[in-house]
A protein has these predicted regions:
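Signature for HUH/AEP ssDNA processing cores
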Residues: 16-79
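Eukaryotic short linear interaction motifs
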Residues: 39-41, 82-83, 97-99
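Catalytic "initiation/cleavage/transfer" segments centered on a nucleophilic residue
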Residues: 1-24, 95-143
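Histidine-centered divalent-metal-coordination microenvironment in nucleic-acid enzymes
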Residues: 72-95
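Short, solvent-exposed polar/charged micro-motifs at secondary-structure junctions
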Residues: 41-43, 84-87, 133-137
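Short aromatic/hydrophobic contact patches that present stacked aromatics
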Residues: 31, 90, 143
Length: 143
């Protein structure tokens, strides 16, 4: 990917998060990778993952248990070396109401795997792993 594209995406992401922090004193970054179980992954097209993602995002308004405190999201679609599409998702939650990012990531992941993909999906809760510079968890407007 060209350096200009990376720079533009970084600036756009920073602007987006800054805009959310203008109206919210805290954001809780919830990172979850959404994918498909190995036995189904080879049959999943980019069109399928796009439809599943759209359905999940469209359903946010009606699923207050999982998405009631969601303020926004950043999602990166990828296709792995073996051709399996998956999503790297960062859900930005109201940090005054959501403090347990790992718990929220499990809620989102289970919704993806059980309801959206009807048992064909799986997820990885990135909030339960240690990263050097993870960019997840609580962000205060003063940061």
């Amino acid at each position: 990917m060209a350096n200009n594209t990376i720079k533009r995406r970084k600036e756009s992401t920073e602007k987006y998060i800054d805009a959310l922090l203008e109206n919210n004193s805290k954001l809780c970054g919830v990172r979850v990778d959404l994918k498909y179980k190995q036995e189904f992954a080879k049959d999943v097209s980019l069109d399928t993952i796009n439809k599943d993602l759209k359905r999940m995002l469209d359903n946010r308004r009606n699923n207050k248990t999982v998405f009631g405190n969601n303020l926004g999201y950043i999602i990166k679609k990828e296709v792995s070396d073996n051709g399996n599409p998956h999503l790297h998702a960062l859900f930005l939650e109201d940090g005054n109401k959501v403090q347990k990012a790992a718990y929220k990531a499990d809620q989102i992941g289970k919704y993806w795997s059980e309801d959206i993909t009807k048992g064909k999906g799986c997820y990885e809760n990135c909030n339960r792993r240690e990263y050097k510079n993870n960019g997840i968890g609580m962000v205060d407007y003063t940061d």
